[in-house]
């Protein structure tokens, strides 16, 4: 495959962050050519009827979206959707602009098909990013599905964390198709402490109240959690999300664990701190998803992310309770045709297993009472 040849002979030798910046700029330049995004969406986008799923009051053409972290500043939403993603989650965006952590801060573990990052929420801030997204909406109406992932500004003290999130929520209230409160990145000191329910409750309540005051009580609100939470903490967050009337949970963010890696331990240690994404996260992310589905059933929309590489991975997440799935590292290693391969593969797996729609398959491996549609057999 051409991309694999380019990756292994060229891209892997280039600093990971620089490679990302150059390739993303190239994609945006291509998408700027009149008619290109329309053609790309027609060729690469999900078209199989089995893939359509209605979530958050919108019809998603397929389950696979781009996870937060790739397009932090809403610079390439149209271009990324044209690659075949059903939705793009921008961010993480913070209340104030910030440069993130010192470079280098993004590393590939090729032997593990993984990435270690300690980017530190580098972004232009919610004021600038919301203005860019507003301009995009003015040009394209709301034909693209865009989620917004918000986090805490590093220099903001913990005592002002809620106000920082609220600032971003207010700015994106009329622009986002769904809003994600990110309390699970390992790269902002103290951020994961916000996952404790006694701190998460006032935060989520304040964000929900802000959306109500902004005239968007219907804006879907989700929380993104870490894979490193203990089982009882996962249950506590799930229960809180149901209690507060949230719309969903994204499971999971990156992990701080380095267990079971094929890369030499000394090489891994030399990279330093950061969140690990990619194939090594697969099993734990699936475990967390299963636990969430068993806890909340269909009361919340679950979005699965972490270690999804193949159609089989995505299909397993859907059967375990995910209505939508997301990827980032899979795109880096799989190349620009990766979204199309995932969507086509999932459609084939749905047909193989007797489902007329992927919506019928959500949670069937956790809820034995669910069965394929007889009309599809």
From Swiss-Prot:
Its EC number is 1.3.5.2. The active site is at 185 (nucleophile). The keyword Amino-acid biosynthesis does not apply. The keyword Repressor does not apply. Pfam families: DHO_dh. Its main location: membrane. It catalyses: (S)-dihydroorotate + a quinone = orotate + a quinol. Pathway: Pyrimidine metabolism; UMP biosynthesis via de novo pathway; orotate from (S)-dihydroorotate (quinone route): step 1/1. GO terms for molecular function: dihydroorotate dehydrogenase (quinone) activity. GO terms for biological process: 'de novo' pyrimidine nucleobase biosynthetic process; 'de novo' UMP biosynthetic process. It comes from the Bacteria. Belongs to the dihydroorotate dehydrogenase family. Type 2 subfamily. Catalyzes the conversion of dihydroorotate to orotate with quinone as electron acceptor. This is Dihydroorotate dehydrogenase (quinone). It comes from Thermobifida fusca (strain YX). The lineage of its organism: Bacteria, Bacillati, Actinomycetota, Actinomycetes, Streptosporangiales. The gene is pyrD.
């Amino acid at each position: 495959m051409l991309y694999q040849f380019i990756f292994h002979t060229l891209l892997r030798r280039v600093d990971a962050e620089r490679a990302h910046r150059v390739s993303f700029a190239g994609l945006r330049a291509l998408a700027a050519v009149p008619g290109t995004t329309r053609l790309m969406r027609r060729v690469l986008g999900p078209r199989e009827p089995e893939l359509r799923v209605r979530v958050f009051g919108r019809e998603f053409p397929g389950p696979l979206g781009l996870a937060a972290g790739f397009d932090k500043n809403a610079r390439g939403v149209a271009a990324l959707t044209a690659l075949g993603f059903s939705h793009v989650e921008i961010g993480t965006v913070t209340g104030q602009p910030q440069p993130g952590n010192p470079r280098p801060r993004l590393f590939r573990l090729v032997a593990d098909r993984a990435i270690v990052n300690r980017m530190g929420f580098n972004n232009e801030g919610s004021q600038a990013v919301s203005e860019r997204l507003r301009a995009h909406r003015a040009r394209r109406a709301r034909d693209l599905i865009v989620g917004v992932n918000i986090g805490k500004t590093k220099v903001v003290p913990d005592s002002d964390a809620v106000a920082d999130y609220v600032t971003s929520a207010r700015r994106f209230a009329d622009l986002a198709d769904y809003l994600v409160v990110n309390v699970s990145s390992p790269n902002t000191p103290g951020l994961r402490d916000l996952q404790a329910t006694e701190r998460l409750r006032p935060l989520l309540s304040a964000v929900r109240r802000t959306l109500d005051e902004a005239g968007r009580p219907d804006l879907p609100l989700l929380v993104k959690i870490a894979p490193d939470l203990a089982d009882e903490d996962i249950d506590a967050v799930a229960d809180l999300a149901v209690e507060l009337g949230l719309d969903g949970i994204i499971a999971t963010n990156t992990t701080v664990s380095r267990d079971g890696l094929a890369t030499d331990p000394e090489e891994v240690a030399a990279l330093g701190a950061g969140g690990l994404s990619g194939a090594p996260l697969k099993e734990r992310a699936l475990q967390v998803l299963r636990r969430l589905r068993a806890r909340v059933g269909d009361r919340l929309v679950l979005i699965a992310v972490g270690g999804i590489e193949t159609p089989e991975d995505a299909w397993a997440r859907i059967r375990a309770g995910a209505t939508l799935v997301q990827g980032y590292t899979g795109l880096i290693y799989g190349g620009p045709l990766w979204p199309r391969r995932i969507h086509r593969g999932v459609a084939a797996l749905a047909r193989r297993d007797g489902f007329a729609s992927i919506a019928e398959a959500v949670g069937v491996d956790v809820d034995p009472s669910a069965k394929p549609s007889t009309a599809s057999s």
